[in-house]
From Swiss-Prot:
Entry keyword Cell membrane: no
Organism: Arabidopsis thaliana
Gene: BHLH146
Sequence ranges of Low complexity compositional bias: 77-90
An example molecular function term from Gene Ontology annotations: DNA binding
Name recorded for this polypeptide: Transcription factor bHLH146
Entry's Gene Ontology cellular component terms: nucleus
Coiled coil regions, renumbered to chain: none
Residue span of region Disordered: 77-110
Keyword Transcription among UniProt keywords: yes
GO terms under biological process: regulation of DNA-templated transcription
Subcellular location: Nucleus
Length: 158
């Protein structure tokens, strides 16, 4: 039986890092990103676009088991020059205002929101609704973990 630690809130954590998906992702992510950033740091002419490309590439390489990751990796790899790579799907996000109408066409509103979600998820426009909804949860979790890892890297470097 594997050893476990229980914290005060009765949450059980595995002591084996490979059993914790968040830890596995973070370890993979930093192992891809840190060497790339060190390499960029040696080149003082690195642009924001180049850094963003490396951040997105590390995200895609760290979560290859997901369809959105493979689409993102394909998109990033299709450009040999990171400065010409189109931005990731999270750029250009616009917030849709909900119309305040009673008894409106709710079905049409749901369809519109699903279309917007498909645009946000890498490869989402090529997925059916069930697959897209499954993938979006994983994508959001990986973005949250990416944010935590990037904040940690920034704190450690200052």
């Amino acid at each position: 039986m594997e050893r476990q630690i229980i914290n005060r809130k009765k949450r059980v954590f595995s002591l084996e890092p490979n059993k914790n998906p968040s830890a596995v992702f973070t370890r993979k992510y930093t192992s891809h990103l840190v060497p790339a950033l060190k390499k960029l740091n040696m080149n003082k002419n690195s642009s924001k676009q180049t850094v963003k490309h490396e951040v997105d590439m590390a995200l895609a390489l760290s979560a290859q088991e997901f369809a959105w990751s493979r689409f993102l990796l394909q998109k990033l790899s299709s450009s040999s020059n990171p400065t010409t790579t189109t931005s990731s799907s999270s750029d250009g996000i616009r917030i849709l205002e909900r119309p305040d109408k009673e008894g409106g066409n709710e079905e049409g509103g749901i369809e519109e929101r699903l279309r917007e979600l498909k645009k946000l998820l890498p490869g989402g426009e090529e997925m059916n609704v069930e697959e897209m909804l499954s993938e979006i949860g994983n994508y959001i979790k990986c973005l949250e973990l990416q944010t935590i890892a990037l904040k940690s890297i920034v704190q450690d470097s200052t």
